[in-house]
Each structure stands twice: as C-alpha cells, then as structure tokens.
Amino acid sequence: MFSTIVDLILPPRCGGCHLAGSWLCEICLRRMRRLEQPLCRRCGAELESPRGGCGCRGRLRSLTRLRSAVAYEGPVESAIQRFKYQGWRRLASPLATLIAERVLVEGLAASMVVAVPLHRDRERQRGFNQAELLAHELRRRTGLRAPPGRLLRIRTTAPQVGNDRLHRWQNVKGAFEWRGPQLSGRSVIVVDDVATTGATLEACASALNEGGAGPVIGVTVARVRI
C-alpha cells in the first residue's frame, strides 16, 4: 500500500538513472541494447554465428517462439529491478512499449495476451503481478484482448534467480494450469519481464496448449545472456 501511494504522488523519475522528468529517459532508452542478429529463430537467443544453434528445440516443445526487446543489462536491468521489487508500477507503460515495438518488428500475430501468473501468496506479498501490469499495457497498445479464463500458478515455486538450466526447468514443470473455456486453437502471447532459459514461459505454454490454445508466443522486456 505504501509503495502504491508513493508511486502516485511522486513526480516521474527514470527507472534507469533516477533523472527526474520521465519514467524512462531518452538517454537510458538509447543506452538499452537491442538484441543483435544472428538470433535463434525459435527462442530469440543471440548466437555466435548464423550457422550456430542454441539447443532450444529439444526444450521448447510448447512455446512456438520467444522474443525479447532488449538485453538484460544497464538501464533496463535497473528499471526492471525497481519495477519488480520497489513498486515502481508506472514503469509498466514504457517497458511494455519496448515489448510492443518488438511485437511489431517481428510481426508476431496472436488473438490474445496473457501474463505469466504469480502464485497467490507471492502476489499478496508483493502487492501486484508485474507481468500482469505489462500484459495490460501491451493489450492497450496492440488492441488484443485478455483470454476468457485464467492461467494460474497452482503451486509455489522457488525463485529462478541463481538456478542452473536444469533446475530452472524442473522448478516450473507442471506449475501452471489453464482454467476456463477451451481456447479452440486461438494463438496466445504470454508476457513476462525477463527471460533466461525460457523455462517459465514454456511451462505456461504447455498449460495453455492443454487448454486448447494454438501457437503460443512468449515475449519479455529483456533477455539474460547465458
């Protein structure tokens, strides 16, 4: 509650550098590094060479594509930390704009937008779900709608930070469930703040596929290079 009040009454300050005037200043926006080609056509990871591979095909079975706007470093890392852990909710708008630009550039088509859910206990503790704020703003920018049901995190999972690749996948396997009418082959964009291995987005895509979804595309603000 306190963070919400502070967010409403304080003037905008850049989430990247704390400069007053806007939630993301032009200098920080220019400093954010867009992911560079060559990229994996499936998961969007940066590759060493056009002929290289990242090995994602054996892991991403439900997620059709994964795309991130920028690299998780510098100003965007600071902004996401403030957004996620310090309650700077107004950052949802400029961060979602970065996602929307990537969706447009990539020509990513879908029928609806859904957020990666938090478990209810963690959302109660934090006070909000940062991915839902991003998804809401992305819907506003794209005109896509929310789904006719809910994607739920049905069990608590340990934070992914610090886990190696194997434990990330094991941690979220079976952690999500679609509750609502059958999605009848409709395509879905799933939104999160940061992607590392894509394990969380893949687990969400699996649950959506079980609910009848067609292609599921994961999008995030930033991507961690591993």
Question: Model-predicted segments: where are they?
Answer:
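Glycine-rich phosphate/pyrophosphate-handling loop used in enzymes and phosphotransfer proteins
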Residues: M1-I226
